[in-house]
A protein has these predicted regions:
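Face-selective signature of the C-terminal outer-membrane beta-barrel domain
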Residues: 296-311, 340-531
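Periplasmic N-terminal accessory/gating domains of Gram-negative outer-membrane beta-barrel systems
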Residues: 83, 88-90, 96, 118-173, ...
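Short, acidic Ser/Thr/Gly-rich low-complexity loop/linker segments typical of extracellular
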Residues: 49-62
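Short, acidic, small-residue-rich periplasmic hinge/interaction motif at the N-terminus
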Residues: 32-34, 42-49, 78-83, 93-136, ...
C-alpha cells in the first residue's frame, strides 16, 4: 500500500511540474506613428530567448504574442524609417497590453548617383530643362532656344522664340503646358516686339518635342509639338538673378498635399537694339508673371491652377539709317527719320484642372482654360532718303546738325532722293475659352487614352495701315488726280466660332524573343463652325527595341495632319485701282493638310564619362491645300 501511495505521489508531482512549465502569457497592443496611425508590418520580436520569437502588425498596427511566463522579457519594436523601441517586462504573467509609438527616423544618407537609360517612346524627344538656365540667349533663356539643336529645326531671328520645323511656318508649331495648348499674340511683326516666351524655365520639370508624326493626343498643327510640364516643388526653393538686360525672381514651396510656384520676369533689350543698323531711341520693356498651384482634395484627386499675365511695351523713335551694299560699285542708302512707334501687347491666360483616379486602372481629368489678348500697334514715321555712290559722310550733312535736307538739292554722288511716310493704327482683341476632358485606362501592357474638348472663340480686329512714297516729285504739284499709295490695308472685322475636338489612342507593348515591340494606333476628329468642316486624322506608329541590343531603338510613324485656320489665315484681301487693300473673312477656306512618314532610330551609349544619344531620321511630307503666305521678319501674312 505504501508503494502505491509513493507512486501516486510521484505522478502528482510530475503533473504539477508539467502544468507549471506549460503556463503561458498573452501580450498584445498597437504600434502607431506620431499621428497615432497604425503602422502596418512593424516587427515585434522577443530578444532574450534562445530561439527567435516574433510577429508583425496587421494593417491597423495590431499585434499579439503568446509567450511562456518568465521573470524578465525584452520586446523590440522596429520598422524601416522609424526608430527602434525596446520594452523590458518584469515578471511576465497572464495578459499584458502594451501600446508603442514609433518616431520617424531621420538620417542623412551619403550622396549617391543613379544612372539609367530611358528609351524615348514615339517621336517625342526629351530635353533637359536645366540646360536653358546656363545657355546664352537673347530672348531671356527660353526653352525654344534649345530646339534649334534638333534636326530640321531652324530659327531666323535671334530676338524671337519662334522657329521653323522642316520647312513649315511659325504658325505650324503647337505648344502645350500641362496638357493645355497656349496661344501667341497675333499682331507681332518683329522680334523686337515679341519679348519673353510664355514658358518660364525656372518652373519647368519636363520638356518633350516632336518634329513630326506625333500622337493623336496632340492638336491640329502640321509641323511640330512642344509639350511642357511644370514641376511641383517638394520643399521651399527660390532663385534671383539680375543684369543689365533684365531680372527674374522665382519662389516655390510644397509638401505632400500642397505646392505653389511664383515666377516674375522682367526684360529690356534697349542696349542690344542700340547696335542695330537703324539708330534711334529704343525703349522696349517686357513683363511676365506666372503662378502654378496644386493641392490634394482627397486621397485620389488633385486640383491645379495655372495663371499668366504678360505685357510687352515697345517704344521706338528712329533717328537715322546708313547702309552700304554692293561689291566693286558700292552704293549707300542713308535715311533720316521723324516720328515714333508705340506698341502694346497684353495677354492673360488661366487654367483650372482636376485630375483623379476612379479605380486602379482608370484616371480622368477635366480642364477649364481661358486666353485673352489685347494688342495695339501705332506708328507714324516719315523718312527722307538718299541713294548714292559710296559713302554719304562727305556729301550729306549729318542729321544731328539740325539742317533740313532738301531731297531735290543736287549732290555730287546722289543717284536719287525721296520721301516716305509709314502709318498704322492697328488693334486686335481676342478671347478663347476651352473646356476639355481626358482619360487613361491602363491594364498590363495596354494603355488607352482619350479626350474631348469644346472651344469658343471671339475676335475683333481693326486695321488701318498704309505707306506713301514720293521718289520723283510726282505728287507736287497736285494734278488733281487721286494720289496713289504704295501700300494700304484697311479692315474692321469680328468673328465668333466654336470648335469640337476628340481623340482616342491605344498603345500595346509586346515582348517577344526578338525584343520589345510597341504598337500605337489612334485618331483625332475635329469640327469648326466657321466653315462647317469635319476633319478626321488617323495616326499610327511602331517601335522595336531589339533583345540583342537594348540600347538601340527603331521606329516608324505616320499620320494625316490637318491645320484648321485660326484667324490670320481667314483674311481675304481685295485691292482696288487706287492701291487700297481691304480685307474680309473667308468662310470657304479649308484646312491645310499634310501626310507625315518618319523612319528613324536611336542609339544610346556612354563616352567621356557622360551619356549620349545618336539619332538618325528620314522623313517624308506631302502637303496640299496649302495657303500661300509671305514672311516679313516674324510676321506671317496669308
Amino acid at each position: 500500500m505504501s508503494k502505491i501511495l509513493k507512486i501516486v505521489h510521484l505522478l502528482l508531482l510530475c503533473a504539477c511540474s508539467v502544468f507549471a512549465y506549460a503556463r503561458t502569457a498573452r501580450v498584445y497592443g498597437y504600434v502607431v506613428d506620431q499621428d497615432n496611425i497604425g503602422i502596418e508590418l512593424a516587427n515585434v520580436v522577443v530578444l532574450n530567448t534562445d530561439k527567435p520569437i516574433g510577429t508583425a502588425t496587421n494593417k491597423n498596427g495590431y499585434y499579439e504574442l503568446i509567450l511562456d511566463e518568465a521573470d524578465t522579457v525584452v520586446l523590440s519594436y522596429s520598422m524601416i524609417g522609424y526608430t527602434t523601441v525596446q520594452q523590458r517586462i518584469l515578471d511576465l504573467r497572464e495578459v499584458l497590453n502594451i501600446n508603442v509609438q514609433l518616431l520617424t527616423d531621420e538620417q542623412v544618407l551619403a550622396e549617391i548617383e543613379v544612372r539609367g537609360i530611358q528609351h524615348t517612346q514615339g517621336t517625342m524627344d526629351r530635353i533637359d530643362a536645366a540646360t536653358t538656365r546656363v545657355m546664352p540667349d537673347a530672348t531671356g533663356g527660353s526653352i525654344e532656344s534649345l530646339l534649334i539643336t534638333f534636326a530640321g529645326v531652324s530659327q531666323t531671328n535671334e530676338l524671337s522664340s519662334q522657329y521653323n520645323v522642316r520647312g513649315g511656318s511659325f504658325d505650324e508649331n503647337s505648344v502645350y503646358v500641362n496638357g493645355i495648348e497656349v496661344h501667341r499674340p497675333l499682331l507681332i511683326r518683329s522680334g523686337q516686339q515679341e519679348g519673353l516666351s510664355f514658358v518660364n524655365p525656372e518652373m519647368v520639370e519636363n520638356v518633350a518635342f516632336s518634329a513630326g508624326s506625333f500622337g493623336a493626343e496632340y492638336g491640329d498643327k502640321m509641323s511640330s509639338v512642344l509639350d511642357i510640364t511644370y514641376k511641383r516643388p517638394p520643399a521651399f526653393e527660390a532663385s534671383l538673378s539680375a543684369s543689365l538686360l533684365g531680372a527674374h525672381v522665382y519662389v516655390g514651396h510644397g509638401d505632400s498635399t500642397y505646392s505653389q510656384m511664383y515666377g516674375l520676369r522682367y526684360k529690356t533689350s534697349k542696349y542690344m537694339l542700340g547696335g542695330l543698323a537703324t539708330a534711334g531711341n529704343y525703349n522696349p520693356t517686357y513683363f511676365d508673371y506666372q503662378t502654378y498651384i496644386t493641392w490634394q482634395t482627397g486621397p485620389k484627386w488633385q486640383m491645379s491652377f495655372l495663371g499668366n499675365v504678360s505685357l510687352n511695351d515697345y517704344r521706338f523713335t528712329p533717328d537715322s539709317l546708313s547702309e552700304s551694299f554692293g561689291g566693286q560699285e558700292a552704293k549707300n542708302l542713308t535715311i533720316y527719320y521723324e516720328g515714333q512707334e508705340k506698341d502694346r501687347f497684353l495677354t492673360a491666360f488661366a487654367a483650372l484642372s482636376a485630375k483623379g483616379k476612379v479605380s486602379d486602372e482608370v484616371e480622368i481629368g477635366f480642364d477649364l482654360s481661358g486666353f485673352y489678348t489685347n494688342e495695339r500697334e501705332n506708328f507714324d514715321i516719315t523718312g527722307e532718303y538718299v541713294l548714292s555712290n559710296g559713302s554719304m559722310d562727305e556729301t550729306q550733312p549729318s542729321n544731328a546738325t539740325g539742317e533740313e535736307i532738301d531731297p531735290n538739292a543736287p549732290t555730287v554722288d546722289a543717284l536719287g532722293t525721296g520721301l516716305f511716310h509709314q502709318h498704322a493704327r492697328n488693334s486686335l482683341e481676342a478671347g478663347v475659352i476651352t473646356l476639355a476632358h481626358q482619360g487613361t485606362w491602363q491594364r498590363g501592357n495596354n494603355t488607352l487614352i482619350w479626350g474631348i474638348s469644346g472651344q469658343a472663340e471671339l475676335i475683333r480686329d481693326r486695321i488701318s495701315e498704309w505707306e506713301w512714297r514720293d521718289s520723283a516729285g510726282y505728287s507736287l504739284p497736285n494734278n488733281g488726280l487721286p494720289m496713289e499709295l504704295y501700300y494700304s490695308m484697311r479692315g474692321d472685322t469680328s468673328m465668333t466660332s466654336a470648335r469640337l475636338q476628340a481623340y482616342i489612342q491605344n498603345t500595346h507593348k509586346w515582348n517577344t524573343s526578338s525584343g520589345q515591340w510597341i504598337f500605337t494606333i489612334g485618331g483625332r476628329l475635329q469640327w469648326w463652325s466657321w466653315n462647317n468642316e469635319v476633319l478626321p486624322s488617323p495616326r499610327a506608329s511602331v517601335e522595336w527595341i531589339p533583345g540583342w541590343k537594348r540600347d538601340l531603338c527603331f521606329r516608324l510613324a505616320t499620320g494625316l495632319y490637318y491645320q484648321a485656320p485660326f484667324y490670320k489665315e481667314l483674311r481675304d484681301t481685295i485691292t482696288d485701282e487706287f492701291g487700297i487693300t481691304r480685307f474680309d473673312l473667308n468662310h470657304d477656306l479649308k484646312a491645310q493638310r499634310s501626310v507625315h512618314v518618319v523612319l528613324g532610330g536611336d542609339y544610346y551609349f556612354r563616352a567621356w564619362g557622360r551619356p549620349f544619344k545618336l539619332t538618325a531620321e528620314g522623313y517624308y511630307k506631302y502637303i496640299d491645300r496649302m495657303e500661300s503666305y509671305s514672311v516679313d521678319n516674324v510676321r506671317v501674312r496669308y
